[in-house]
Swiss-Prot record:
Species of provenance: Homo sapiens (Human)
Disease connection: Intellectual developmental disorder, X-linked 41: A disorder characterized by significantly below average general intellectual functioning associated with impairments in adaptive behavior and manifested during the developmental period. Intellectual deficiency is the only primary symptom of non-syndromic X-linked forms, while syndromic forms present with associated physical, neurological and/or psychiatric manifestations.
Record's protein name: Rab GDP dissociation inhibitor alpha
Signal peptide region: none
Tissue-by-tissue expression: Brain; predominant in neural and sensory tissues.
Pfam families recorded: GDI
Organism classification: Eukaryota, Metazoa, Chordata, Craniata, Vertebrata
Gene name per UniProt: GDI1
Amino acid sequence: MDEEYDVIVLGTGLTECILSGIMSVNGKKVLHMDRNPYYGGESSSITPLEELYKRFQLLEGPPESMGRGRDWNVDLIPKFLMANGQLVKMLLYTEVTRYLDFKVVEGSFVYKGGKIYKVPSTETEALASNLMGMFEKRRFRKFLVFVANFDENDPKTFEGVDPQTTSMRDVYRKFDLGQDVIDFTGHALALYRTDDYLDQPCLETVNRIKLYSESLARYGKSPYLYPLYGLGELPQGFARLSAIYGGTYMLNKPVDDIIMENGKVVGVKSEGEVARCKQLICDPSYIPDRVRKAGQVIRIICILSHPIKNTNDANSCQIIIPQNQVNRKSDIYVCMISYAHNVAAQGKYIAIASTTVETTDPEKEVEPALELLEPIDQKFVAISDLYEPIDDGCESQVFCSCSYDATTHFETTCNDIKDIYKRMAGTAFDFENMKRKQNDVFGEAEQ
């Protein structure tokens, strides 16, 4: 370990593993360490099931009705991949897709007046949907046509809207959309967690709705994908990429100290040895004095023996409960997957309800979601602090990732990755940087 590296990475969460992969592909010498004996950090999948019970201090362990412990891979952080989103792009560019198998999530649902409705995925579904009345549908269709044709580089498509100054509230007004449709559009399509976006320039919202539609167009059922064997497969896929390009991995490796000289990182000390480096990437748990708390998320993992009611017996789905429907500031989400994804025993389902904490009784906040899941065989409640770095790391060369937020997709995580890359490399992130180099010394032969 007593060696000189360009970059040392602490923690094998998804953000850290993707950055480690990119740095290795770009010719950097990388050492990647984790104090845990497993990959994934906060974003790991726990197996066998006995391990999950232990982690949540349920000492009696799983009953026999849960089947074989080894058949379970339970995500600690519930997220899906947008089919046309940035993480899929990263997987394709790096060819990490060859280590993973994905399934399309069967449906996306939205909560309205105590019931759940399928988010329409085709024009026919939209016309048949009970989510809105006849005239509302016509106006909504006009709005969707506007979004589909919108091109930020072609003012002819703006229809009198200025993407940089017109607020989204004004765009909704222009198409005369009612409150329910606005809730549905902002939260189930643009996937905002709160209503803060309404008074911001509309460009980002329009682009988010386009991303949803384009992702949906790829597979038809929903815009989301999920990897077989759980999300823990993602960091491992990128760790393989890093290793192929010469990255060194050490799990179960305690970090005793991060060594600084004149305010700059110069190395990491572990078990009496020092590895030197020019730059350091880590998750917040490794540098508690360089991060601040930015809120909390509650996630309740529920094991069920039945599909969720009114989802047409889907073996995977997402449910969004827009905040307006339950008098909150932030949406509540449910991600459900099952034995069909090799993450649970035969006939079992895993539904994870999550939201940003707003009160001193977080469990009560998630109740509307839990009511949709009854009866629940077993619950595991996790309340996590969200951390963000206190500075950009440019001076110390210590670059810290943000905690995983309450969103049900990876777009915010990818933004964090691109942002850290830019601060480390001094140049904007470009997907081309992730391409495997042809015929290089570490390149794998085609399968």
